[in-house]
């Protein structure tokens, strides 16, 4: 059963084993810190590439966004949704959660002490939206983030149906999904997948696996969970 948290542009679906978690208050504080910083730092908000800074006394969300941005060669705001998911999950884990799934606009952070199925929203006419990752139980967090040149409101310069990245940190998965999706260009879907895979090679240390879908071509790199055909999901992107 999902709990919904809606705060301005943050729309979260939450499944957790914690009854009284106060997560909404925690996310509200994250958003306040972010909004306060953005008002004074327009480059942080608008840049499409990493931003140099020399400040030391930064709030945790700003630090993590700067770090993920520099790892992934994208602007800090390309990592914001994944970062909020990641920090929300860390907060729940600090409260002793062993099973929590946070989905923030398609960017997921999960810890699951039992099997879970995460739907892949590709908007692909052949696959439909009936495939998902079967995630084995694990005690450490996982980020699963998707970027698309065809759906969603994020900026993408590529044309893949979807690029899904799995990484230990959702902030990094979010930034990498954007970066790799931007490289999904070419004269046909085969070229798009090939170019995106080539771009992924530069970031192998940062992810567990990448899945790229473009029309009738699919490519993957790294280690992905088992992909299953189903309509029964614990969470959808």
UniProtKB/Swiss-Prot annotation:
InterPro entries: ApbE-like_sf, MA1715-like, UPF0280
SUPFAM superfamilies cross-referenced by the UniProt entry: ApbE-like (SSF143631)
Protein family membership: Belongs to the UPF0280 family.
Name of protein: UPF0280 protein ORFE
Organism from which the protein derives: Methanobrevibacter smithii
């Amino acid at each position: 059963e999902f709990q919904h948290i809606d705060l301005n542009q943050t729309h979260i679906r939450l499944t957790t084993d914690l009854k009284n978690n106060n997560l909404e208050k925690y996310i509200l504080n994250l958003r306040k810190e972010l909004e306060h910083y953005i008002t004074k730092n327009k480059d942080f908000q608008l840049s499409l590439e990493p931003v140099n800074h020399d400040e030391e006394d930064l709030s945790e969300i700003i630090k993590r966004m700067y770090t993920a941005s520099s790892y992934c060669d994208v602007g800090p705001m390309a990592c914001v949704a994944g970062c909020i998911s990641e920090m929300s999950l860390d907060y729940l884990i600090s409260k002793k959660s062993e099973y929590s799934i946070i989905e923030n606009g398609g960017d997921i952070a999960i810890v699951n002490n039992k099997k879970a199925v995460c739907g892949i929203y590709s908007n692909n006419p052949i696959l439909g939206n009936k495939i998902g990752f079967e995630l084995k139980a694990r005690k450490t967090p996982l980020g699963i983030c998707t970027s698309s040149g065809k759906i969603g409101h994020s900026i993408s310069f590529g044309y893949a149906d979807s690029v899904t990245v799995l990484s230990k940190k959702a902030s990094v998965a979010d930034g990498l999904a954007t970066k790799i999706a931007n490289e999904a260009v070419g004269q046909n879907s085969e070229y798009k997948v090939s170019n995106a895979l080539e771009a992924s090679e530069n970031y192998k240390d940062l992810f567990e696996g990448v899945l790229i879908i473009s029309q009738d071509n699919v490519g993957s790199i790294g280690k992905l969970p088992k992909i299953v055909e189903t309509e029964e999901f614990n969470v959808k992107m």
